[in-house]
């Protein structure tokens, strides 16, 4: 055990001061100090309420609020001395307040515990973070809409199993990511509703004997409602878990998008070019231009998945109410929010700058018999059962593989080997343009539908 000792503000019950190493081990100020603004916001609302119900005088309230605002200025100017021996952001600010204004500072904590204080701080912080993240999602979606509108007629191969499947437009492909991000946006908006509940007033676990006005504090802090049960108020971290779950889904989407960008920029695909400002080089290979931004986003998804798993594991064995375990909720939550926000920002900056290589995309779509399904549909319209058509086209594809010809490159006589229902008009069906234009329905890849989807997307963003 360390022989160095330190004293805590709650030491009245103890016969010896806490061991210095234990003090450092249990302190959270190194990471929870980022809650300072929300801690001060909550304290100002709490002081205002205490004055309203007569626990503080108006003069005491004003002195406390002025002191808290001064402390916020000190922190933001980098002039605040964060002390590990004071454990956390709450006690550091309270101690500094008492240093500045004297005994009145000690009255601020009346009717409040650090248990409901920290639960309130985290909710205030996460509410703001969600708003920032929603803004980045919208910015990324705007970039996708702009690209999709420009590339409504650009044809590329669509894939299943990473094998050529059917022709699609690049605009249509980009709008798939728009749809995923719309769901991410909705999940986070929904999560924000449950985050925006105020635990302040729950005190340690059972509430307080003081005549507090929780509705007033709730209104001052912009919460939608108060937590309905004091035990749950200080114990609940569902909102943090729910956020990390929504963030995990969003990062999974960005990771899949990243994988496609990495593939598309490779020499083997060459579908797109990323501007140099989003890439790095190699220390040994002079020719390299590495897509580091999407690669890092793909890798960082694991951090957010880990945060979700960590929080679930953290909470699963805890009895009510607050336990010291919950100190470990902040770092994974902070990291998940930072990672998602930064990843979205990188993508929102990068996506509008992507340069598709139209000729290469088109050439790739011409390989792999991408219009085979169109030929089968053509035969269905001639009255044949689809399963028979499927087999007929399969034989035609095998012939194409053996002869090195795509379906559109075969002569009419060659095609008629497989069905006498095939006529000259089949070649309009077998073109890339014919294929994509034929899928002219809501959600289809036809250029007209891409443009219509862009209009709907713009209306959605404008409604937020």
UniProtKB/Swiss-Prot annotation:
Similarity section: Belongs to the lyase 1 family. Argininosuccinate lyase subfamily.
Reaction(s) this enzyme catalyzes, per UniProt: 2-(N(omega)-L-arginino)succinate = fumarate + L-arginine
PANTHER family: ARGININOSUCCINATE LYASE
Top enzyme category: lyase
UniProt xrefs under PROSITE patterns: FUMARATE_LYASES
Any one annotated GO CC term: cytosol
GO biological process: arginine biosynthetic process via ornithine; L-arginine biosynthetic process
Keywords: Amino-acid biosynthesis, Arginine biosynthesis, Cytoplasm, Lyase
Cytoplasm recorded as keyword: yes
Pathway: Amino-acid biosynthesis; L-arginine biosynthesis; L-arginine from L-ornithine and carbamoyl phosphate: step 3/3
Taxonomy, superkingdom: Bacteria
Molecular function as annotated in GO: argininosuccinate lyase activity
Protein's cellular compartments: Cytoplasm
Keyword Lyase assigned: yes
Natural source organism: Pseudomonas putida (strain ATCC 47054 / DSM 6125 / CFBP 8728 / NCIMB 11950 / KT2440)
Gene3D superfamilies per the UniProt record, alphabetical: Fumarase/aspartase (C-terminal domain) (1.10.40.30), Fumarase/aspartase (Central domain) (1.20.200.10), Fumarase/aspartase (N-terminal domain) (1.10.275.10)
Protein name listed in UniProt: Argininosuccinate lyase
EC number(s) given by UniProt: 4.3.2.1
């Amino acid at each position: 055990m360390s022989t160095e000792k330190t004293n805590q503000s709650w030491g009245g019950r103890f016969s010896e001061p806490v061991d210095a190493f234990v003090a450092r081990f249990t302190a959270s100020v190194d990471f929870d100090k980022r809650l300072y603004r929300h801690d001060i916001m909550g304290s100002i609302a709490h002081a205002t309420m205490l004055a309203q119900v007569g626990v503080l005088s108006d003069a005491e309230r004003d002195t406390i609020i002025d002191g808290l605002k001064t402390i916020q200025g000190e922190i933001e100017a980098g002039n605040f001395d964060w002390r590990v021996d004071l454990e956390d952001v709450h006690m550091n600010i309270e101690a500094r307040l008492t240093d500045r204004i004297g005994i009145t500072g000690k009255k601020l904590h009346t009717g409040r515990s650090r248990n409901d204080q920290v639960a309130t701080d985290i909710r205030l912080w996460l509410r703001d973070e969600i708003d920032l993240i929603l803004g980045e999602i919208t910015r990324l979606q705007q970039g996708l809409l702009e690209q999709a509108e420009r590339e409504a007629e650009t044809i590329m191969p669509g894939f299943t199993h990473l094998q050529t499947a059917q022709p699609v437009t690049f605009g249509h492909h980009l709008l798939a990511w728009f749809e995923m991000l719309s769901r991410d946006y909705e999940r986070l908006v929904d999560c924000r509703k449950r985050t925006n509940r105020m635990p302040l007033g729950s005190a340690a676990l059972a509430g307080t004997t003081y005549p507090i006005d929780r509705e007033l504090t709730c209104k001052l802090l912009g919460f939608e409602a108060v937590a309905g049960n004091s035990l749950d108020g200080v114990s609940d971290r569902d909102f943090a878990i729910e956020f990390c779950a929504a963030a995990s889904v969003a990062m999974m989407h960005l990771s899949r998008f990243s994988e496609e960008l990495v593939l598309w920029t490779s020499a083997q695909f060459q579908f797109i070019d990323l501007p140099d400002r989003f890439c790095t080089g190699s220390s040994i290979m002079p020719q390299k231009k590495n897509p580091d931004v999407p690669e890092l986003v793909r890798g960082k998804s694991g951090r957010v998945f880990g945060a979700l798993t960590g929080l679930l594991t953290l909470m699963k064995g805890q009895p009510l109410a607050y336990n010291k375990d919950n100190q470990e909720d902040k770092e994974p939550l902070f990291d998940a929010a930072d990672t998602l926000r930064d990843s979205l920002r990188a993508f929102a900056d990068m996506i509008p700058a992507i340069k598709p290589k139209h000729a290469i995309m088109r050439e790739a779509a011409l390989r792999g018999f991408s219009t085979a399904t169109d030929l089968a549909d053509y035969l269905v319209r001639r009255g044949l059962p689809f399963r028979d058509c499927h087999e007929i086209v399969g034989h035609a594809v095998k012939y194409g593989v053996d002869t090195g010809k795509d379906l559109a490159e075969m002569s009419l006589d060659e095609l008629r080997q497989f069905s006498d229902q095939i006529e000259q008009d089949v070649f309009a069906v077998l073109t890339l343009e014919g294929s994509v234009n034929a899928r002219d329905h809501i959600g289809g890849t036809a250029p007209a539908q891409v443009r219509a989807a862009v209009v709907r997307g713009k209306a959605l963003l404008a409604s937020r």
